[in-house]
A protein has these predicted regions:
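N-terminal amphipathic/basic-hydrophobic helices that include classical n-h-c signal peptides
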Residues: 1-11
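Conserved RNA-binding domains used in RNP assembly and mRNA/RNA metabolism
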Residues: 9, 13-105
Length: 105
């Protein structure tokens, strides 16, 4: 029989995530840094040169990921553990997201 390795079973059972997260109810949500592109609008007059320099806004959001599908990403930044409710919510079309990075502890 192989010799048992002390502590090996405990470390497997109690393995902690190296990523920032919260547990709400029975579900774990991970904290992300999202880089995304937003529309930029201007109702004023512009020259050709000004119009050619017109770009989308490059945005950064820090939030917990509620859920993801192939089309959308739902996020929240505030929550209440007792009533399992979420605030500061957003939904992003996946096509607007440039980068998603899970935040380390």
């Amino acid at each position: 029989f192989p010799k048992p390795v002390l502590g090996k079973i405990d470390s497997m059972v109690n393995k902690k995530s190296k990523y920032r997260h919260v547990k709400i109810g029975s579900k774990t949500y991970y904290f992300y840094r999202l880089e995304w592109v937003d529309i930029t609008g201007d109702a004023g007059h512009a020259s050709v040169e000004e119009f050619d320099k017109f770009e989308c806004s490059k945005m950064i959001t820090h939030a917990y990921i509620y859920k993801k599908t192939s089309k959308f990403v739902w996020t929240f930044a505030s929550y209440e553990e007792k009533d399992v409710s979420f605030s500061d919510r957003n939904i992003f079309p996946v096509g607007c997201i440039v980068k998603m990075e899970r935040i380390l502890l």
